[in-house]
């Protein structure tokens, strides 16, 4: 069992895997104005006229298997381990995709190894996962109480995030300090 004071939860879609780019590339021929939105982290909300096409693309077999990694994602994952943390994927499944969990685990195994795939949390409720921090592109996470702190993975659509902690890509030099602070506060809350 992992020591929760060393676990860093990492979202998959938008943080490790370039979900939006895959959707945009698939839809560009028929939806030329679709792009990463500055207003919503959900493409189907930012472009409601394309909601059905987006659902068709993201629920297709092979969608998750074919995702490309976010720039420097593998280096960032390795850095977490080099810093002494235990990175764990914490990702939500898409209900409309019948093979979502299996494809996500396959993608993780190919990119990060079998252990990362095996240890991944593919759950609807990220709040229940133990750790000191959750690195996620979602602008805000409603979890009370939660053991972990939300670190926003910088994207155009989360600039208005209320989170005081922000990671500007995997090579952001603030990463070690963000995690050190999260671990210190986690241990204080736990009385360690």
Predicted regions and their residues:
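Short, acidic loop-to-helix structural element flanking the phosphoryl-transfer center
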Residues: 56-89, 96-102
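Conserved Lys-Pro-Asp/Glu-containing loop-to-beta segment of HAD-superfamily phosphomonoesterases
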Residues: 117-146
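Acidic, Mg2+-coordinating phosphoryl-transfer loop and its flanking beta/alpha structural elements
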Residues: 135-171
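Active-site neighborhood of HAD-like aspartate-dependent phosphohydrolases
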Residues: 1-55
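Charged phosphate-binding loop/patch that engages nucleotide di/tri-phosphates or the phosphate backbone
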Residues: 5-7, 156-192
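Active-site donor-binding segments of glycosyltransferases and PAPS-dependent sulfotransferases
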Residues: 86, 92, 99-127
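Short catalytic/ligand-binding loop motif for oxyanion handling, primarily in non-cytosolic enzymes
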Residues: 17-20, 25, 87-89, 96-100, ...
């Amino acid at each position: 069992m992992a020591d929760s004071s060393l676990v860093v939860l990492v979202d998959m879609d938008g943080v490790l895997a370039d979900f939006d780019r895959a959707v945009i590339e698939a839809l560009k021929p028929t939806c030329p104005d679709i792009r990463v939105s500055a207003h919503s982290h959900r493409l189907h909300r930012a472009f409601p006229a394309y909601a059905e096409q987006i659902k068709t693309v993201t629920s297709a077999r092979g969608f998750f298997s074919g995702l490309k990694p976010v720039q420097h994602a593998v280096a960032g994952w390795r850095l977490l381990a080099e810093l002494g943390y235990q990175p764990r994927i914490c990702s939500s499944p898409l209900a409309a995709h019948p093979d979502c969990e299996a494809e996500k685990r396959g993608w993780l195994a190919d990119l990060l190894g079998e252990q990362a795939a095996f240890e991944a949390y593919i759950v609807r409720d990220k709040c229940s996962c133990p750790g000191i921090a959750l690195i996620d592109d979602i602008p805000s996470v409603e979890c009370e109480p939660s053991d972990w702190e939300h670190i926003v993975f910088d994207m155009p659509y989360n600039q208005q995030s209320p989170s005081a902690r922000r990671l500007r890509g995997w090579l952001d030099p603030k990463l070690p300090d963000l995690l050190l602070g999260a671990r210190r506060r986690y241990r204080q809350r736990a009385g360690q």
